[in-house]
């Protein structure tokens, strides 16, 4: 998913989903905002072409006979089982399509885990960044001919936080065909 916050809103909204029976989350919504921000930053840093993958989604068809089970309980059991097996935070929604012929779960999950303790890096001296966000060694390297800092260049002052890491690297197993 390249817009996890938008997708979560879409699958969990009664206004957007006519036949929404239950929504279950293993973490707070704030987690997804931070995750999206982290993934976007990592994507820019990597210089990769294409779209940033902020999270993944599985759409799981269920037998129509499952409509006999309590929706909240069914979704909670399913989602907690996934989290327990893969250690991934999830949000899930239980739906029917418009014609009520396809009972299914939307399961959105993260490829990253929240670190027990965030890694916060503080500048031990002034740090200079050029227009591309690349760290350069000296202030001279970001000055224009007029002696002023060029547009889009920046300085992180000594003592300021320049990097805050809240999540682990992505779990590669979610990219493999064997996972599916």
Which residue stretches match the model-derived regions?
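N-terminal nicking endonuclease/strand-transfer module with a His-rich metal-binding environment
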Residues: 1-180
